[in-house]
A protein has these predicted regions:
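Well-ordered beta-sheet/strand-loop patches within structured domains
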Residues: 4-24, 28-327
Length: 327
């Protein structure tokens, strides 16, 4: 029996993403066909019951599932590290637990991340322990609360998200400064058991590709630190980061300055920096300080190419009648 080559041929097809925005990968199809004339010649020349071999021509598509997968979560878009070296064990446990809840969380284009939804209620049943947290203003402003320390994780994630140029949906500052992050770049979160204001930290994936949150803690005898990274796909219009700088000129001299390898050596790298203006004030609540935080971008020549105010509709106010360094 003779077959036509088109009966056995398989057209090559490149791998592709699904069209539903979920970035499911449909694998490639390897093309194959054989030369019918060569097969016919070999068949006619063959003896009775002789086996003939017909070479198959194989075409590997240029875009494979592996190459598409390699484009996802390939580039470090934003990162932040904060320290909790002097925290008690309960607070350390809460930080580790919150970090584990947000770790490996994926956001597709248009998705909104809600810290409270992902981490969940800070309850004993969920594994949270009592640790110092802000609960008001004045002498009784710091008390042990279940989940104390959760705000360090939300604040670290908030900084990573604005380094990555993600869209902030909701963010509220603490009533007092915290010692693990620069003024104007913190983000408090609460889920009251009954009544009270729910405070969340939310941001949107405004990219054309999915992003992944990576969160981890490192603890030694000398230092305990929390790192949150946001991985995605660097697009042509994005600033390729080579340095993240969130340096505070404040009493505790907090410094975060991370240099990273350029994702694409043929593109210009940029330094992304937070700069905070501070204004003192006094009202019925006492002395305070307001901040306006800028996101600045510098090119490889050290020239400022972008200066924009974060949360431009309102400045961040902190009570300053005393200093507490919790949550």
């Amino acid at each position: 029996m003779l077959f036509r080559s088109q009966d056995l041929a398989v057209e090559p097809m490149e791998a592709r993403f699904s069209d539903d925005g979920r970035f499911t990968i449909y694998p490639e199809t390897v093309g194959c066909w054989f030369d019918t004339e060569a097969a016919k010649t070999a068949w006619l020349a063959a003896g009775v019951a002789e086996t003939i071999v017909v070479p198959i021509q194989v075409t590997i598509p240029a875009v494979t599932a592996a190459s598409l997968e390699a484009t996802l979560y390939h580039d470090l878009l934003g990162a932040m590290t904060t320290r909790y070296t002097n925290s008690g064990e309960n607070r350390c446990s809460n930080v580790r637990l919150c970090a584990s809840r947000i770790n490996e969380h994926i956001l597709y284009p248009g998705d909104v991340f809600s810290y409270n939804e992902v981490v969940g209620k800070r309850t004993e049943e969920a594994g949270f322990l009592p640790a110092p947290a802000y609960v008001g203003v004045g002498e009784d402003s710091v008390k042990d609360e279940l989940g104390g320390g959760a705000c360090q994780v939300s604040s670290t994630l908030y900084c990573a998200s604005i380094f990555a140029f993600l869209e902030t949906i909701e963010r509220t500052a603490h009533v007092y400064p915290v010692n693990y992050i620069q003024l104007g770049t913190d983000a408090t979160v609460t889920i009251p058991e009954e009544g009270g204001n729910v405070m969340d930290m939310k941001f949107r994936n405004n990219k054309n590709y999915p992003i992944k949150i990576v969160a981890y803690t490192e603890e030694t005898e000398e230092m305990k630190s929390l790192t949150v990274e946001i991985w995605g796909t660097l697009e042509e219009t994005d600033y390729m980061p080579v340095e993240f700088d969130n340096t505070a000129s404040y009493t505790w001299d907090l410094v975060y300055d991370r240099v990273i390898e350029p994702a694409y050596p043929n593109r210009e790298g940029y330094k992304i920096k937070f700069e905070t203006e501070r204004f003192s004030f006094e009202d019925a609540m006492g002395a305070g300080r307001r901040t306006i935080t800028h996101r600045e971008v510098y090119n490889s020549a050290g020239e400022k190419v972008l200066d924009e105010i974060l949360n431009p509709t309102i400045s961040t106010g902190y009570a300053m009648d005393t200093y507490y360094y919790h949550n």
